[in-house]
């Protein structure tokens, strides 16, 4: 090979190398942008709050009648929750809120259970409300926080019986917690309302809906950034896999008109669950609106489920 050919080959290799670097750099930028857009609680943007229909009357009740409690997470964050003590001894509900919301978003659910005698605990998820944290975990790191909240309740009251109750991201959180090997046996049942199968599935759907993009390569790049910045992987954050492991009776609820967390996810979750299970479909309800749209259907189903599984 003559000198000219060698120089040409070197130039071509340099160009290819630079193009690869540019492509990798572009992927990192895209991944970082998506991470900031979707998982940074302080950034403007995101997919919008999954608060459903919020009633200020219940928020006022919660803020007036509750006391503040705190917990240090496994990774050192100070987490906040509202607690309202109920009339029935040893009966507790841990209620988990949705994406870009806070504990007050679960006030109406908390009031219903409080009226049944439950002591209700409404945590602010990490990165939300008054809890520390600089990222949204979409339920995966929060599942460990839920286990810790349960352990704290049991340390105070070894005879505690607990229901985990979540809406939207909170529903994914309690499903993910239900598959943990160290979930206390005092957790008697789980109620999930419009939770997603996995973070990957949910983000894939939102990418297509909002930007017309496929998951590859955006989510792959975002997953790498998430591992670096938040310490968890989007690919491992699966409620579907966790309910396969769960032995805790679970009520699956979904609004038939939900497009934010698509209605088809209900059946996949329900079929995957290996625990004792029930299902409630709410006609006409969009995302996180089932209780408000059809209270005459919703609350009797919830109450009957609780009556079967809480002493």
Located regions from the model:
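An N-terminal hydrophobic leader/cap segment in hydrolases
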Residues: 16-72
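Alpha/beta-hydrolase active-site loop
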Residues: 105, 136-157
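Conserved alpha/beta-hydrolase
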Residues: 110-132
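Hydrolase active-site cap/lid region
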Residues: 176-233, 241
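Short alpha-helix in the alpha/beta-hydrolase fold that links the catalytic acid
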Residues: 239, 248, 262-271
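Short beta-strand/loop motif that positions the catalytic acidic residue
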Residues: 245-247, 252-254, 258
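Acidic catalytic loop of the alpha/beta-hydrolase fold
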Residues: 256-261, 288-289
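Catalytic histidine-centered segment of alpha/beta-hydrolase-like enzymes
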Residues: 285-299
């Amino acid at each position: 090979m003559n000198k000219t050919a060698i120089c040409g080959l070197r130039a071509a290799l340099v160009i290819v190398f630079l193009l690869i670097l540019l492509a990798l750099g572009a992927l990192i930028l895209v991944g970082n942008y998506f991470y900031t857009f979707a998982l940074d609680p302080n950034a403007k943007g995101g997919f919008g709050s999954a608060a459903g229909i919020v009633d200020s009357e219940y928020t006022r009740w919660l803020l007036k009648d509750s006391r503040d409690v705190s917990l240090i997470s496994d990774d050192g964050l100070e987490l906040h929750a509202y607690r309202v003590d109920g009339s029935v001894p040893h009966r507790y509900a841990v209620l988990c809120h949705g994406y870009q919301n806070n504990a007050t978003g679960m006030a109406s659910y908390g009031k219903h259970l409080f009226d049944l005698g439950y002591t209700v605990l409404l945590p602010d998820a990490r990165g939300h409300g008054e809890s520390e944290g600089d990222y949204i975990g979409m339920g995966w790191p929060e599942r460990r926080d839920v286990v810790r909240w349960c352990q704290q309740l049991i340390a105070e009251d070894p005879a505690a019986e607990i229901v985990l109750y979540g809406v939207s991201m909170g529903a994914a959180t309690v499903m993910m917690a239900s598959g943990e090997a160290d979930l206390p046996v005092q957790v008697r049942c789980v109620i999930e309302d419009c939770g997603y199968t996995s973070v990957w599935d949910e983000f894939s759907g939102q990418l297509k809906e909002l930007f017309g993009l496929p998951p590859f390569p955006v989510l792959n790049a975002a997953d790498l950034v998430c591992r670096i910045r938040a310490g968890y992987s989007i690919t491992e954050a699966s409620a579907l896999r966790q309910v396969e492991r769960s032995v805790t009776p679970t009520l699956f609820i979904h609004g038939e008109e939900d497009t934010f967390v698509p209605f088809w996810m209900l059946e996949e979750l329900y079929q995957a669950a290996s625990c004792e299970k029930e299902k409630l479909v709410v006609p006409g309800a969009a995302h996180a609106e089932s209780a408000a749209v059809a209270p005459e259907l919703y609350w009797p189903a919830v109450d009957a489920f609780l009556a079967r599984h809480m002493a």
